[in-house]
Amino acid sequence: MDDLADCREVFAYFDSKGDERISVQQVGDVLRALGQNPTEAEIHKCVGSFDREARLSFEDFVPIFQSVSKNREKHTVEEFVEGLSHFDKEGNGMINVAELRHLLTTLGERLSDEDVDQLLSGHNDSHGNVNISDFVRAVMNS
């Protein structure tokens, strides 16, 4: 199945009224169901031209999906590893789990403690450190 067919199938699943439309508030859920992981800021940017009560057709949704998909491709594993490597004090590819938790809950699009617990689960070693490359790959592939 190609991306557009997947997109149409998931879009139809979220069409609760049977009018071949989804609400603006559902856009993020549909994108996530399609394997995307947009930030709330990205979603807001994509739907900002629509009224909050608007219902989007599939034709309205496709450019949003394509935009988010393209943005995701721009961010590579290497870029995220490089960004986190600035916090690698020992130069051994590891970051302290407490410091990583602090970064994830205070910078950029802040994550909740529960989300961070889920992300970090199983990634820290016996010394309280996380392998940066392994962590980034696991997060990007989830």
UniProtKB/Swiss-Prot annotation:
GO cellular component annotations, sorted alphabetically?
actin cytoskeleton; cytoplasm; myosin II complex
The cross-references to PROSITE patterns, in alphabetical order and at most eight, read:
EF_HAND_2
Q: Name one GO molecular function term.
A: calcium ion binding
UniProt KW Cell wall biogenesis/degradation keyword? no
Where would you find this protein in the cell? Cytoplasm; Cytoplasm, Cytoskeleton
Pfam families recorded:
EF-hand_7
Gene Ontology terms describing biological process? mitotic cytokinesis
Q: Where is the EF-hand domain?
A: 2-37, 75-110
Q: Do you know which CDD domains this protein is assigned to?
A: EFh
What results from gene inactivation? Arrest at the 1-cell stage embryo due to a cytokinesis defect characterized by a failure to form a contractile ring.
Principal subcellular localisation of the protein: cytoplasm
Q: Which UniProt keywords apply?
A: Cell cycle, Cell division, Cytoplasm, Cytoskeleton, Motor protein, Myosin, Repeat
Q: What does this protein do?
A: Required for cytokinesis and embryo elongation. May regulate myosin II complex formation and/or the association of myosin with actin. May be involved in the organization of mlc-4 and nmy-2 into bundles.
Query: Subunit info?
Result: Myosin is a hexamer of 2 heavy chains and 4 light chains (two regulatory light chains and two essential light chains).
Q: Please state what the protein is called.
A: Myosin-2 essential light chain
Give the organism the record lists. Caenorhabditis elegans
